[in-house]
Amino acid sequence: LTLKLHNRISEIGESAWNGLRDDDNPFTSFAYLDALEATACVDQASGWQPVHLSLSDEAGVIRGVMPLYVKYHSMGEYVFDQSWAQAYEQAGGDYYPKLQGAIPFTPVTGARLISPDPAVRQALAKAAMSLCDSNKLSSLHITFPREDEWKMMGEMGMLQRQDQQFWWGNNGYSSFDDFLAQLSSNRRKVIRRERRDVQSRLDLRWFVGSEITETHLGQMYAFIESTYDRKWGSPYLTRAFFSRIRETMRDQLALVFAYEGDQAVAGAINFSGGDTLYGRQGGTLIDVPFLHFEVCYYQAIDFAI
C-alpha cells in the first residue's frame, strides 16, 4: 500500500472518500469535511491544519482514508487535554503541534479509520503513528472513534480513554406521549408542564431540506453567535460554512425555530444520517424558562419519533 498525505480533502475526491464509508454518518462525509476547508473553518491559521491520509494499492486505487489534522492548540476537540499539555511542557517537551484524528468541532462517534478492510484500517493507524515520529509531533490523538476502532488501537498499544455521553433511543414509540408513558408519573408531569409553558408563548416550526433558506441560516447563525458570545467567544463554524452545507448536504439538514409572533427568537440545527438525528448547535435571543430543553431535546425527540 502507498501512503499519501493530503492538505485538502478535495485531493482525494468525493467518490473515492465516500465510496469507502459504510454508514450515513453526516460528519465523516466528504461534503461536511470539504465544507470545513472551503469556508476556512479549518486551516493552519485556525490551528487545524489538514493532513488527511490515503492508502492506495498497486493499481492506484484508494483503499483507505483517515481524517487527520496537525493541531497547534486543543480547542474545538471537546476532549480536554490541557492538563496533559501543561505536564508535558513542565517535563521539558513541546506538546504542540500534535496530530489529531477527529472531525473538527464535532463530538460525535464515527469512523476515523475509513476502509472496509480491517488490515487497511490497522495500516492507517500505524501510518498516523509513524507521522508523529517523522515530523517531530508530540503525540497522536484519535477522538470519538467507533468501538471496533477503539479496541483495535488499544491492541496496537495506544492508550485508551473512556468518557460518557447521553444518547436517546427510539424504542419503537408511536408518539411523544408514547415515550412519556415509559417515564415515571412525576417526570411525565414535569415535561408536559415545561412544554406547555414554552408552547403557550412561542410557536415551534421545523424546516427541512429544500425548505431551508438563506434567511433561516442567517437567523440560526445569530442564535449560535449569541450562545458563543455568552460562553466561549467566536463560533468555530463560519457563516459561509452553513451556506455551503445548504448546497451540498441539504437533504440531511433539519432546523427547528421558536417564533414569538413573526420573529424567530431561538433555534437549533440538526443533521440526519441513516436512522439517527444529530442535534448540533443552537441558541436563543431571549430568556424563556425551559426553552433550551424544548428546542434542543423535546422537539428533536418528537421529530425523531
Residue ranges of each PLM-predicted region?
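Conserved acyl-donor/pantetheine-binding loop and adjacent beta-alpha core of acyl/acetyltransferases
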Residues: Y69-I114
